[in-house]
Curated annotation (Swiss-Prot):
One of its GO terms (molecular function) is rRNA binding. GO terms for cellular component: cytosolic small ribosomal subunit. It comes from the Bacteria. This is Small ribosomal subunit protein uS17. The keyword Ribosomal protein applies. Belongs to the universal ribosomal protein uS17 family. The lineage of its organism: Bacteria, Pseudomonadati, Chlamydiota, Chlamydiia, Chlamydiales.
Length: 83
């Protein structure tokens, strides 16, 4: 069991919109897709609460990775700062 590999975890890239909480940031992830019926390009965004272990601040572009539940809302953690 110890040599068993962990499955791939989801990763997303977004912008930090809030870093006022202690060790927690809010990351906005934007998704652009074509509407299936009307073929219009739609821009959609979603906010994720992520554990901040790298001390990132507002406006930073970061990569977040899925992890175990850390609190009621946090299921993601900041992996790296993307330039």
């Amino acid at each position: 069991m110890a040599s068993e590999e962990r499955g791939l975890r989801k990763t997303k890239v977004g912008v930090v919109v809030s870093s006022k909480m202690d060790k927690t940031v809010v990351v906005r992830v934007e998704r652009i897709y074509s509407h299936p019926q009307y073929a219009k390009v739609v821009r959609d965004s979603k906010k994720y609460y992520a554990h901040n272990g790298l001390d990132v601040s507002e406006g930073d572009k970061v990569k977040i990775q899925e992890t175990r539940p850390i609190s009621k809302l946090k299921r993601w953690r900041v992996v790296e700062r993307v330039s």
